Design a protein with these regions (language model features):
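Single conserved hydrophobic/aromatic residue that forms the stacking wall/gate
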Residues: 1-15
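N-terminal helix-turn-helix DNA-binding core of bacterial DNA-binding proteins
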Residues: 38-82
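Short, locally clustered residues in the helix-turn-helix/winged-helix DNA-binding domain
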Residues: 60-64, 125, 152
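Terminal interaction helix/tail motif
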Residues: 20-24, 31, 126-162
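Exposed loop/turn and edge beta-strand positions of beta-sandwich/beta-sheet ligand-binding modules
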Residues: 2, 52, 107
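N-terminal leader segment of winged-helix/HTH proteins
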Residues: 13-49
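Charged, amphipathic alpha-helical coiled-coil/dimerization segments
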Residues: 89-146
Length: 162
């Protein structure tokens, strides 16, 4: 190896690693912050000014299909039932979510979106669709596949964290 023959192998590798580490760290931190800021500006419009990005993520987790149990929603968001209950209570008061106890087992509580909640869900869905379209519009099929695989690995890493 060229660098090893000049006694620079380990030093060079360490420097390359640090450059990559610093670049990736900077990009990831900036990217997460940018996504949160952009999402907040894009999602909280005049129509939905009474909810936060966190509320919007709860709305997304409730979904537009059949009612979901509070337990299922809390697991999908990775939050405690207490935390979810506080968020759902606020969304019920604002008219985005309804709550109903199970008919067979009254201990089970189901949440579903109102028409207002469905409109917020669609707004959020369109934001994500537009974001993905803009990110991928200038990529080749191969570049899009590499980007997708990279994000899947990143997601897998985050899911393995305690």
């Amino acid at each position: 190896d060229y660098y090893a023959s000049r006694g620079l192998g380990d030093v060079y590798k360490r420097q390359v690693f640090m450059d990559i580490f610093e670049s990736l760290n900077s990009v990831l931190v900036d990217l997460f912050n940018d996504i949160l800021n952009i999402e907040e500006r894009a999602l909280i419009t005049e129509e939905f000014k009474d909810i936060s990005v966190t509320d919007m993520h709860i709305i997304e987790a409730v979904g537009i299909e059949e009612p979901r149990t509070m337990s299922t929603i809390s697991k999908s968001l990775g939050v405690t039932m207490g935390t979810l209950t506080v968020g759902i209570n606020g969304l019920v008061k604002k008219g985005y979510v309804t709550r109903k106890r199970g008919e067979k087992d009254r201990r089970i509580v189901y949440a579903s979106l109102t028409d207002k909640g469905i409109a917020a869900y669609r707004h959020h869905e369109n934001f994500h669709k537009d974001m993905i379209e803009n990110i991928t519009k200038d990529l080749t099929k191969e570049e899009a596949e590499v980007l997708t695989k990279t994000f899947i690995r990143l997601e897998d890493f985050f899911h393995q964290l305690p």
